Amino acid sequence: KAVIMKAIEASVTSSASVTALTRLDAEYQPSANGLEGGVLVLPSTTTSGAATAYSTIVDKGNTDETGGSYANLHVLAAGASGTLDVTVETSSSATFASDVSTALTFTQVTTSETSEFKDSAVTVNRYNRVKYVTVGGSSAYTLVVTFGHYR
């Protein structure tokens, strides 16, 4: 399970010292929809070189949801060159053999760490997965994706 929140930074304070650890305190407030429940679809995964790959399939255990979906992408490390494209795919088939459609598309990632929240009113089917495509010889990325659907 994962808790997903689109947030606004309320306050940040830090204490800096040359001889001790730096302490960072931050407060965030939900900016829309409050806290939502979801699942960790793609745990911390590191890519290497050009490839197309998929997460494990998430079975929501019920039929299509017409309320839409939401997801967070966190890129914890990015390579010196290349690109990363991440989408959430949905299907009524557990094998993704037919009727595969894209529920969410994240902004293309290049050479810097980032995070992004996406949501959509598109109907999501029972089965969902993350597709990620890396292009470029030095396209090493470490990423995490969480996903949920509105009820």
Where are these regions (language model features)?
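C-terminal interaction-tip segments
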Residues: 45-47, 134-151
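Solvent-exposed, flexible loop/coil segments flanking beta-strands in beta-rich domains
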Residues: 34-67
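Beta-rich globular "head" domains
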Residues: 56-89, 127-132
